[in-house]
Swiss-Prot record:
E.C. designation(s): 6.1.1.9
Keywords: Aminoacyl-tRNA synthetase, ATP-binding, Coiled coil, Cytoplasm, Ligase, Nucleotide-binding, Protein biosynthesis
Domain of life of the native organism: Bacteria
Subcellular location: Cytoplasm
Gene Ontology molecular function, alphabetical: aminoacyl-tRNA deacylase activity; ATP binding; valine-tRNA ligase activity
The name this protein goes by in its record: Valine--tRNA ligase
Reaction(s) this enzyme catalyzes, per UniProt: tRNA(Val) + L-valine + ATP = L-valyl-tRNA(Val) + AMP + diphosphate
Pfam families, A to Z: Anticodon_1, tRNA-synt_1, Val_tRNA-synt_C
GO BP field: valyl-tRNA aminoacylation
């Protein structure tokens, strides 16, 4: 029946050919991934929506993307096959700082700066760059086979998204939730822009703690000593602060001291902020260069002035003009020593804020910026998570979320960049600000057309926090449409825990504020991928494999399967490229098992049409099944129950292992092997055809269950089961459901056969019986029922154990035989003629000596009180477990030796 020989499945699985045939282009061409609001609003379909975290337009595919998008694809494909109107919303982020930096670097190579070009021409260059390179990440994601509705692809600078951003800013300003204020912000001297607190990462740094003496103005023979790690800011000191409860300085409060080098007189003030235990208990107050000092200065009406500029160099007024801040630090310490003000230096390790992108120390900088008041937005966003309206997976990330929300600060949203959404604020010649959706509206409000727009742009995250809304066509407050009514709130967000506050929390705030509902129901936090040494993947370490090269070597399905298989919920992933052999081997196993089953189909059905008709009408019938078939159906339905339960609990890693374990173990290692024996034995045509249809039916169910994980190979093989049209795809097939009628199926007979096969193999291995030699086994059944069960394996035993088996309730044990007991039934394997007794005795004696020595070393270690009391409890428990296992092994080896003696 060659016309349907595995529907021409090649002998060897070639992932290049299969995946090229099924690239997303084919699925897209037939509209597989399209979702329509009409099917929800008019036909009553249940919606299921996933938001793609928009990758930076500057990005290229990483293993982090692979894990994140594979998980999203699994959720969306599963929902689609569960009959839901599944919508996955794709898009990219304009990535303000990153994109501007890339384009500026390109211009510098051409000898041009953005200032040479001017704002308009520079932005034209950025748009040109985006058109040429900005789609790379999406093309690479398509190679992964992800099933987005690509018609809905959105870029955060697209007209619709930009309209939403501007209207949101205007609305929040008019509500009093956006304001312009003079505050200490995080300044990146490389990117030359303000940063939000979340864009600053803390790193441990070793500096000098500098102790400086400040003489009293009225009596320079007396002084007060402070300790600081920033002596370069001494020229901007406006006070010395002490704790009002610190008796050491009680008599100095209100006195004036002389600022070293500067020579100015500043007061000693009392403030509860001062930590009595830190340093000397006295602090220099430099409000322009420290946010805490700034708050102290406001409380005491102190002046504020700066000595470090935007370029992190000392300003003209301070006497060290033009020096880099760190060079100035060294010079000022030297000058303090020369002038007699330096008391001492100490090594000091502390956490310092760095720009996450530029990797330079952030400078606290006093400037006018735009802010969002976060407290009114945070309270309802905290409540919905506390109340369980939004669920986190794993749950422990709720604690991180709570910490952020309970300690929230106003959000600095202005950035000193050109690429981004320009702040919709205009100024008249008197300095009044007019916030409006357009220049024309601003002119109308101001009563003049002589207005200049704010030069700054909005933080990239200001567009991202609206993502659940803008991807569905929302253009601002009071905006509504059919997509929003059908697909908002979305269902599942898959993202990294590192942006819980950057993005997750802010989306929750925006959704609640503008739509009165949460933006999503569940948040799945992905694992961090590390190399095999436990290090985070990075280009600088050279330990970050190129996913496209991995795909070329192992296949997309293999990479997708592997990365989910090794990524338990809430645990870091140790990834080495060689681990993808796991996925490749599994794909090969699926392919080979499918080819075998299809070959049996050819043997039992005269024509393709005959099989197709039989399979279309196939229903598993117990009376036509062998014990292996009934066992398979019991195991298959148990697998489906566990599969769906794992998906309901977001245990994708468990789900993948459940299917892998069933297919490789139950289906291939046991049922397919049993089927070989069954079909070569004395079997009627009806039962044979039924057995093959059962094998194909379960195979098809496994392919459907695996499709969300391995979309290419599953669609390829599914099309080989029966004739399909070009418009058909497994992606829209119904996901198999467990049949409760098989839940209580008595599978004990085949379980006994399986256990007996395993023990025969184990005994052969224990006595070193060569694999190519056939042995004689005798099984003494414990009861008539056990004998009946074992007789169902008569055809299986020779094929799976290379043993001829004699069965009975009163059979005799052969001389010189190895013995064991399986579920109360006695097993004997005749050894005479199979092995050299003397050689085997020598081998066993040598092994006993080796294990005995190991036992003695373990006993010695566990008798050492120091080890037992100091080692971690799990380590001690593991050593005890090894000891028990070794003792059991010696007893078993001694028993085997006895048999040979």
């Amino acid at each position: 029946m060659s016309d349907h020989s595995a529907q021409n499945l090649e002998k060897t699985y070639n992932h290049h050919e299969v995946e090229e045939r099924w690239r997303s282009a084919h699925w897209e061409a037939i509209g597989t991934f399209h979702a329509e609001h009409s099917r929800v609003l008019k036909e009553g379909a249940t919606p299921y929506t996933v938001l793609m975290p928009p990758p930076n337009v500057t990005g290229s595919l990483t293993l982090g993307h692979v894990l994140n998008h594979t998980l999203q694809d699994i959720f969306i494909r599963y929902a689609r096959m569960m009959g839901k109107e599944a919508l996955w919303l794709p898009g990219t982020d304009h990535a303000g700082i990153a994109t501007q930096t890339v384009v500026e670097k390109k211009l510098r190579k051409e000898g041009v700066t953005r200032h040479d070009l001017g704002r308009r021409d520079f932005l034209d260059k950025v748009w040109e760059w985006r058109e040429e390179y900005g789609g790379l990440i999406l093309r690479q994601l398509r190679k992964l086979g992800i099933s987005c509705d690509w018609r809905r692809n959105l870029f955060t600078m697209d007209e619709r998204a930009s309209e939403a951003v501007i209207n949101t800013f205007v609305a929040l300003y008019r509500e009093g939730l956006i304001y312009r204020g003079r505050r200490i912000i995080n300044w990146c001297p490389v990117s030359q822009t303000a940063l939000s607190d979340e864009e600053v990462i803390m790193k441990s740094r070793r500096d000098k703690l500098v102790y400086i003496s400040y003489p009293l103005a009225k009596d320079p023979t007396r002084s007060i000593t402070i300790a600081t790690v920033r002596p370069e800011t001494i020229l901007a000191d406006v006070a010395i602060a002490v704790n009002p409860n610190d008796e050491r300085y009680a008599d100095l409060i209100g006195e004036l001291v002389i600022v070293p080098i500067a020579g100015r007189h500043v007061p000693v003030i009392a403030d509860d902020y001062v930590d009595i235990e830190f340093g000397t208990g006295a602090l220099k107050i430099t409000p322009a260069h420290d946010p805490n000092d700034y708050e102290v200065a406001k409380r005491h009406n102190l002046p504020v002035f700066s000595v470090i500029g935007k370029d992190a160099r000392m300003t003209d007024e301070c006497g060290y003009a033009g020096m880099d801040r760190f060079d100035a630090r060294d010079k000022i310490v030297a000058d303090l020593a020369e002038l007699g003000y330096l008391v001492k230096l100490e090594e000091y390790e502390h956490n310092v804020g760095y720009s996450e992108r530029a990797d330079v120390v952030v400078e606290p900088y006093l400037s006018e910026q735009w802010f969002v008041k976060m407290q009114p937005l945070a309270e309802p966003a905290l409540k919905v998570v506390n109340d369980g309206e939004i669920r986190f997976h794993p749950e422990h990330w709720i604690n991180t979320y709570r910490h952020w929300m309970e300690n929230i600060q106003d959000w600095c949203i202005s950035r000193q960049l050109w690429w981004g959404h320009r702040i919709p604020a205009w100024y008249d010649d008197k300095g009044n600000v007019w916030v409006a959706s357009s220049y024309e509206e601003a002119c109308h409000l101001a009563g003049t057309d002589k207005l200049s727009q704010d030069e700054d742009v909005l933080d990239t995250w200001f567009s991202s926090w609206l993502w659940p809304l803008t991807t569905l066509g929302w253009t601002g407050p009071h905006s509504d449409n059919d997509d929003l009514r059908a697909f908002y709130p979305t269902d599942t967000l898959v993202t990294g825990p590192d942006i819980i506050f950057f993005w997750v929390a802010r989306m929750i705030m925006a959704g609640l504020h503008f739509k009165g509902d949460v933006p999503f129901r569940d948040v799945y936090f992905t694992s961090i991928i590390r190399d095999m040494k436990g290090r985070k993947l990075s280009k600088s370490l050279g330990n970050s494999p190129d996913p496209l090269k991995v795909i070329d070597t192992y296949g997309t399905d293999a990479l997708r399967f592997t990365i989910v298989y090794i990524a338990p919920l809430g645990q870091d992933v140790l990834f080495g490229e060689e681990k993808c052999e796991l996925g490749r081997n599994f794909a090969t196993k699926i392919w080979n098992a499918s080819r075998f089953v299809f070959m049996q189909r050819e043997k039992l059905f005269a024509t393709r049409e005959e099989f197709v008709e039989a399979f279309a009408n196939f229903t598993p019938q117990r009376e036509l099944m062998s014990s292996a078939g009934r066992w398979l159906m019991s195991r298959y339905n148990a697998m489906l129950e566990r599969y769906h339960q794992a998906m309901a609990n977001f245990k994708v890693n468990d789900m993948v292992k459940i299917v892998h374990e069933f297919f490789w173990g139950d289906y291939c290692d046991w049922y397919v092997e049993a089927l070989k024996s069954e079909l070569t034995g004395d079997i009627t045509e009806e039962r044979g055809r039924h057995a093959v249809c059962l094998a194909v039916s379960v195979l098809e169910g496994v392919l459907k269950a695996l499709h969300p994980v391995m979309p290419f190979i599953t669609d390829e093989i599914w099309h080989a089961i029966a004739p399909r049209s070009a418009e058909e795809t497994i992606a829209t097939e119904a996901m198999p459901q467990p049949d409760a009628s098989w839940r209580g199926e008595d599978a004990a007979a085949f379980d006994l056969v399986r256990n007996m096969v395993s023990e025969i193999r184990s005994l052969r291995s224990a006595f070193n019986v060569p694999h190519d030699l056939r042995a004689q086994a005798v099984i003494r059944a414990s009861s008539p029922a056990a004998l009946v069960a074992l007789q169902t394996g008569r055809a299986i035993f020779p094929a799976m154990t290379k043993c001829e088996v004699e069965l009975g309730e009163s059979v005799e044990r052969p001389a010189h035989s190895a013995a064991s007991v399986v579920d109360g039934n006695e097993l004997f394997i005749k050894l005479e003629g199979l092995i050299s007794f003397e050689k085997e005795k020598q081998r066993l004696e040598k092994e006993i000596t080796k294990v005995t020595a190991y036992i003695e070393s373990l006993e010695k270690k566990l008798s050492n009180e120091k080890f037992v009391s100091n080692a971690p409890a799990d380590v001690v428990a593991k050593e005890k477990e090894k000891l028990e296992e070794s003792r059991s092994m010696v007893l078993k080896l001694q028993g085997n030796l006895e048999v040979l003696s």
